[in-house]
Amino acid sequence: QNRRDFLKTAALAAFGSGLVARQALAGESLLSTIHINKLGLGGKMKMTFFPYELKLRHVFTVATYSRTTTPDVQVEIEYEGVTGYGEASMPPYLGETVESVMNFLGKVNLEQFSDPFQLDDILSYVDSLSPKDTAAKAAVDIALHDLVGKLLGAPWYKIWGLNKEKTPSTTFTIGIDAPDVVRAKTKECADQFNILKVKLGRDNDKEMIETIRSVTDLPIAIDAN
């Protein structure tokens, strides 16, 4: 049974078993107006996208450059009045640009597919449009999964049968900066992440580590570039 059939079966089972009602009672945000006959049986998907500039809370500095913004392109896929959101983020070292992402997304035609539950078919089609453009492809992928999750009324960890308490740890990156800024950044993230990634590569490496250690004993990963 492929993923498309699984999702349609899951959709019918979720609504038929009262899963949505139980989640609603638990206080989760659900699309209670979605009906079974809207799940994979009609309508067309509409994709829109636009560029925007993500403004960073702090200047982000590594050994070779600093930046205060990250260029992004937001993708929205609408189906039956429900919208899924995704984005392509293009930090300078990835080699993609707003222009390249916009050009790729302009080639994507989702209206040829009958519904968003055709995940495998849609993503295979998107991937076939270019051997590169991974950020642009990821934006469509994320928006599509967001849309399907909303139509099912459940987060993806539940759809996949995963335990959110076993989510692998990820890092928060602290860029090179003055001690007071590094201290502030560390305080902001210390209770939200299990590992800190620290950018090094200048003359203040020791000072960076000592400043972070004055705030927290969290494990530190070093990224010197």
Where are these regions (language model features)?
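Metal- or metallocofactor-binding catalytic centers and their adjacent structured scaffolds
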Residues: 39-44, 49, 65, 77-78, ...
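A general lysine-centric signal
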Residues: 8, 137, 197-199
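Metal-dependent enolase-superfamily TIM-barrel catalytic cores that perform enediolate-based chemistry
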Residues: 156-225
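N-terminal secretory signal peptides and thylakoid transit peptides that target proteins
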Residues: 1-14
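Short helix-capping/linker segments at secondary-structure and domain boundaries
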Residues: 22-23, 146-156
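Short catalytic helix/loop segments, enriched in acidic residues and glycine
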Residues: 68-72
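N-terminal amphipathic alpha-helix/helix-capping segment at the start of soluble metabolic enzymes
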Residues: 39-43, 62, 154-165
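C-terminal segment of N-terminal export signals and the immediately downstream linker at the start
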Residues: 20-56
